[in-house]
From Swiss-Prot:
NCBIfam families found in the cross-reference section: S18
Assembly description: Part of the 30S ribosomal subunit. Forms a tight heterodimer with protein bS6.
Source organism per UniProt: Leptospira interrogans serogroup Icterohaemorrhagiae serovar Lai (strain 56601)
A cellular-component GO term for this protein: cytosolic small ribosomal subunit
PROSITE patterns reported for this sequence: RIBOSOMAL_S18
Family: Belongs to the bacterial ribosomal protein bS18 family.
Name of the gene this protein is made from: rpsR
Cystine connections: none
Name of the molecule in the record: Small ribosomal subunit protein bS18
A Pfam family it matches: Ribosomal_S18
Length: 81
C-alpha cells in the first residue's frame, strides 16, 4: 500500500435524470402539467438549474421551454412577491 494515496469516496449520491430513467414520465412534460413543472421551479418562481435537479441537458431544455409556455399563458407565475 506504499506509494499510492488512498482515493477519497464521494459522499454525495450521483444524480440521475428521472426522465431518462422513466420514459413515460418524459412524455408527461407539458405546459398544462403544472404539478410536474412546479417541482422544477423555486418558491420565488425561478427555474432550478440542472446541476441541482440532476436533469439531463435535453430534458432541462424541454422543461424550461414548457415552464416559459405556462408562464406566458398565466398558469405559472413569473415571480412571487
Amino acid at each position: 500500500m506504499e506509494g499510492k494515496p488512498q482515493r477519497k469516496q464521494n459522499k454525495y449520491k450521483k444524480k440521475v435524470c428521472r426522465f431518462t430513467a422513466d420514459p413515460e414520465l418524459a412524455k408527461q412534460i407539458n405546459y398544462k402539467n403544472i404539478e410536474l413543472l412546479e417541482r422544477f421551479i423555486t418558491n420565488r418562481g425561478k427555474i432550478i438549474p440542472r446541476r441541482i435537479t440532476g436533469t439531463s441537458a435535453r430534458y432541462q431544455r424541454v422543461l424550461a421551454r414548457e415552464i416559459r409556455k405556462a408562464r406566458s399563458i398565466g398558469l405559472l407565475p413569473y415571480k412571487v412577491n
